[in-house]
Design a protein with these regions (language model features):
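Extreme N-terminal starter segment of soluble prokaryotic enzymes
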Residues: 1-4
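Active-site glycine-centered loops adjacent to acidic/histidine catalytic or metal-binding residues
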Residues: 8, 55-56, 89-90, 150, ...
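Core catalytic region of metal-dependent phosphoesterases/phosphodiesterases
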Residues: 15-120, 173-177
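Short, conserved loop/helix-junction motifs that constitute active-site signature segments
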Residues: 77-81, 140-141, 170-176, 193, ...
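Conserved catalytic scaffold of divalent metal-dependent phosphoesterases
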Residues: 88-172, 201-204
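Conserved beta-sheet core of the metallophosphoesterase superfamily
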Residues: 160-227
């Protein structure tokens, strides 16, 4: 048997977005809905009857927006022939303690949804562990072919490219599970060796510029073989960042124009001084390395004087100096304390 899995949907109001004319929805809600329905159609077209969401259907934690809840419930109703398995993610909850309330309580009355909240649940060879204050213990003590959960892993990578220290690492999972399917980190990624395979399915759309250029996807899993197939998600506006130099200027401008015609968000980044002439049509930012050595900053200077000189070098407006200085000095005090 095969199932489809996604996660980190992050339905919210997105009131600051432009309204998509065809649906009268904020742009991100429109894109999320498109991606969800494309996944539902994929299930129908490929005889898949089980659809799993690995946490974070909602975005705003203790706030439930009616427009977000309506899209969620309409989706489950539209695909009434599918069986959905849903676990809580951290954004679905009002907190992490035992008194946390889930924003997914409305799923109790949805006949084709199995909602798993609070404690772990086992179905055949699948072990579902929702986000909770005791999830780490449940995962370390559990055992199954397939683990489905929502947490950060030591070896996982954020969209920024860094890893953070977490309560779980690969050594806690090897020997207990063959395949691990996770929500929580939005960057699609996998860690695979001969003993275990771990996948962060990633968010189905690029939710903001922090997820720029990510190849978003959903996964299709064979429960008998634990084989995983990655399928690109479609139907959403992408955040595309293009780095431009004098040597690739013509090609980058062409790519930017094509992406804009397709309705995507486009940012052009200048990595060297280059005359583009497209600043009125595109978001253009400058990321040029500048030499700040030997500019009058010496070891004998006070911290305040060093910071002030640095702000001058970086051409920060003088009106902003006091604000930046306060933050920098506060940070130094905390580190030295």
């Amino acid at each position: 048997m095969k199932f489809l899995i996604t996660g980190d949907i992050h339905l919210s109001r997105y009131a600051q977005d432009k309204v998509e004319e065809t649906s009268n929805l904020p742009e991100r809600l429109h894109s999320i809905r498109n991606a969800l329905y494309d996944m539902g159609e994929y299930c129908y077209d490929n005889d898949i009857d089980t659809f799993i969401i690995a946490g974070d259907i909602m975005h705003s934690k203790s706030i439930i927006y009616s427009i977000a809840q309506e899209i969620m419930l309409d989706f489950f109703d539209q695909y009434e022939d599918l069986q959905f398995w849903i676990i809580d993610g951290n954004h679905d909850l009002s907190g992490k303690g035992t008194g946390a309330i889930s924003s997914l309580n409305a799923l109790r009355s949805v006949s084709n949804v199995e909602w798993i909240s609070g404690t772990a649940s086992v179905d055949s060879n699948k072990f579902f562990v929702p986000y909770s204050n005791n999830m780490v213990e449940e995962i370390k003590n559990g055992k199954a072919d397939i683990l489905i959960s929502h947490f950060g892993l030591n070896e996982g990578i954020l969209n920024s490219g860094i890893s953070i220290i977490s309560d779980l690492s690969m050594k806690d999972l090897i020997g207990k599970y063959k395949l691990i399917l996770l929500g929580h980190y939005h960057k699609p990624q996998e860690i695979i060796d001969k003993e275990i395979a771990l996948y962060y399915v990633g968010s189905p759309i690029q939710l903001d510029w922090g997820e720029k250029n990510d190849d978003k996807r959903f996964l299709v899993v064979d429960t008998e073989t634990c084989e995983v197939e990655s399928i690109p998600t479609t139907g959403y506006k992408k955040h595309i960042e293009l780095n431009v130099t004098n040597s690739n200027k013509t090609e980058i401008i062409k790519q930017a124009e094509e992406a804009k015609e397709q309705g995507h968000y486009v940012k052009v980044v200048k990595t060297e001084t280059v005359d583009l002439g497209i600043e009125n049509d595109f978001m253009v930012v400058e990321k040029i390395d500048r030499d700040i050595t030997n500019r009058g900053i010496t070891s004998s200077m006070s911290q305040s004087d060093k910071f002030k000189k640095f702000l001058e070098i970086r051409e920060i407006p003088e009106d902003d100096h006091e604000r930046y200085m306060k933050k920098a000095l506060d940070l130094v005090d905390r580190c030295e304390g």
